[in-house]
A protein has these predicted regions:
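Metal-dependent polysaccharide deacetylase catalytic core of the NodB/CE4 family, i.e.
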Residues: 30, 35-43, 89-91, 99-101, ...
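N-terminal pre-catalytic segment of deacetylase/amide-hydrolase enzymes
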Residues: 18-90, 244-252, 261-262, 266
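Short phosphate-binding/catalytic loops that engage adenosine nucleotides
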Residues: 68, 115, 225
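Bacterial N-terminal signal peptides
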Residues: 7-14
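His/Asp/Glu-enriched short active-site or ligand-binding loop at hydrolase and phosphoryl-transfer sites
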Residues: 121-122, 195-202, 209-257
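Positively charged n-region of N-terminal signal peptides that target proteins for export
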Residues: 1-4
Length: 266
């Protein structure tokens, strides 16, 4: 009888040692995209670069439905340092120029969804015409979530919204050209930093002009920037992405929310 139990125990041990339990498959690594918005309207958009608040909300609902994380450029830097993409897809929301709809329409919706966003200011125009005012910029930039996180980040869209590369021939020499670049990068940064907590570290190229140009990248670096957002349309390539050539996808009046998913493989 003892021999029977001994044989049974040995058989169980051998079986359990040989049996291979299926381990759960690791979650697929997601993709990251940057979305580029401009003016948001309360009614129907009147030109290609506008988007209605109704369609912006549809975009946000699309993010929720497909579990798309909304992150910041600083989050992107942390992901690159880690060398590993997070599970699930992510998007960085950006808004160009400085329309006052950012304060009246965009800010409340972002707060409702608890989303982060980066706003690129055309500095010369702030407080003029239909552009946002500095008081509103300050109110948005100082708003915090739990833990002191500032979800609304302000970057530079240059001082004068000039072509940074296409008009290069009008300068007499490289020194004059570099002085122009330093003003567009440096003066806009200085003025914005008078109204926000922290530093201005993200720049969006006006018209997408000059992406990858070494003089423009050098000007960004010496003026304290860590990121340049371009208008090249693709997903971000981690870990090989050059942060001075970050692609972005324009979201226009006629963009369908589900078209965003095409860049994420949805």
């Amino acid at each position: 009888m003892k021999g029977f139990y001994l044989t049974l125990i040995i058989s169980i041990l051998l079986f359990s040692g040989c049996y291979r339990y299926d381990e759960p498959e690791p979650a697929d690594e997601g993709k990251i995209i940057v979305l580029m918005y401009h003016r948001i309207t309360s009614g129907e958009a009147t030109n290609l670069y506008e988007r209605s608040i109704e369609n912006l909300k549809k975009d946000f609902e699309y993010f929720k439905k497909h579990n798309i994380n909304v992150i910041s450029f600083n989050d992107l830097a942390e992901i690159k340092v880690s060398g590993k993409m997070p599970a699930g897809n992510s998007a960085i929301l950006t808004f160009d120029d400085g329309d006052n709809s950012w304060f009246s329409l965009v800010q409340p919706l972002l707060k409702e969804y608890r989303y982060k966003a980066t706003f690129f200011l055309w500095v010369y125009m702030i407080g003029r015409n239909s552009f946002i005012g500095w008081d509103d910029v300050e109110q948005m930039s100082y708003y915090t979530l739990e833990g002191g996180v500032h979800p609304f980040i302000f970057g530079s869209h240059s001082f004068s919204h000039a072509y940074l590369n296409a008009d290069r021939s009008k300068f007499q020499d490289l020194n004059e050209y570099n002085r122009f670049l330093d003003y567009e990068f440096g003066e806009s940064k200085r003025i914005i930093e008078e109204h926000i907590p922290g530093k201005v570290e993200v720049f969006a190229l006006p018209f997408g002009d000059g992406a990858g140009d070494e003089n423009i990248i050098s000007a960004a670096e010496r003026n304290g920037y860590k990121f340049i957002r371009t208008s090249s349309q693709s997903a971000i390539d981690i870990p090989d992405q050059d942060f001075f050539q970050i692609p972005a996808i324009p979201v226009l009046d006629n963009t369908q929310s589900d078209a965003i998913g095409n860049y994420l493989g949805i």
